[in-house]
Amino acid sequence: MSVLTFPTGTYHFNDHPLFDFQLNRVVMWNHGDPAEIQARGGEITDFPSWERVLKELSAQAEAREDWAAAAGYLRMAEFFMAPDTPECHAAYDRARKIFYTHFTYLFAEQGGPIHREEVPYADGVLPCWRIVPADTSKGAILFHGGNDSLLEEFTDALLYLAQGGYTVLAFEGPGQGAALRKSGLTFTPEWEKPVGAVLDHYGAEDVTIIGVSLGGELCMRAAAMEPRIRRVVSWSVLPSIYGALMADKPAEIRAKLEHWLDENNRDAILDLYAGLAEREPLFRWSIQHSNYAYGTSDVYEYLQKARAFTIEPVAERITQDVLLLSAREDLLVDFGLYKQEIDLLKNTRSLEFAAPGRALNGQAHCNMGNTEYMLDLILNWNDRMLER
């Protein structure tokens, strides 16, 4: 297999920061064409126009048999659709069908490096990929994403890690991908449970875990509880999901919410957010998506559940080598949270922190503008840790 390369840099595709970031994600991780997106990005003003433009770009890519872009555009069209609807499921299923129909050569059945399996978990299954390197493996990397993660989106990154000499075990956990959409498994704060199921299935020991985006919290929680994890890469630094949600809120609002949540005052919280849900489509979508992925029914239940996703009670149990990767202009996670996390990690075997800036195109969430640099950084760090 040829050596993989990744796009670098960031583009201005849309004046709305979140649409602009997600359009850059289409290019960086989903094989979108920047010229096509530049020409159409300004048409996107709301969720219906997002869906329309991305589906049209997918159809155009399919017509020219650019299957990676066709699947990627459609994968991202689903992103802002109302979750758990027939239309949303149809977009997800079609994107997967395009991918698995036209990239069979990547999978073991056709002689490729990816072994596609399902790991039993709770009342469903966790989709897993096991990718084997061409030569003798240096060790195992366990990889998972975050809030809206799909295995297929990470294909190039996972293959790159395997080309670095590692056996890669990648999975969709509860709340993610097909584990959510097909098995109905919702997010659990006890991330060591799905991690343990995957490690048991493969008989894996002495692994490096990589968690991306929200996965940066999840992997740290798993590391605190799972001794088979020996090295941790938190690719987005957030010691708690609730803390990340509250980071940009005024102190008065944070105090009110804390009090109401402690008092189980559902009505006060629902009243506070009712007007916002009516006025702000983005907030409404965010709550719809969160309720679906976390198995909650309203913003009160979601905030209560989000408070359980924190490393604070278990941080002193994290004794592994740890690499924290942050982004200085992160739209989704407050950069300043790294200070709180470092203060919590008192017992790590070692701790390294990296936050590439604009000069390295690493300023955006998950350092989206320079994936290859980040993967090389991770591989070099892991090699060093294994040599100690």
Show the residue positions of the predicted features.
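Catalytic active-site module of serine/aspartate enzymes centered on a nucleophile-bearing elbow/loop
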Residues: 356-388
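Catalytic histidine neighborhood in serine/cysteine hydrolases
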Residues: 342-363
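N-terminal cap/lid segment of alpha/beta-hydrolase-fold proteins
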Residues: 54, 90-135
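Short beta-strand/loop motif that positions the catalytic acidic residue
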Residues: 318-319, 324-326, 330
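Short alpha-helix in the alpha/beta-hydrolase fold that links the catalytic acid
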Residues: 157, 320, 334-344
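Hydrolase active-site cap/lid region
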Residues: 224-303
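Conserved alpha/beta-hydrolase
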Residues: 161-178
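Alpha/beta-hydrolase active-site loop
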Residues: 153, 184-205
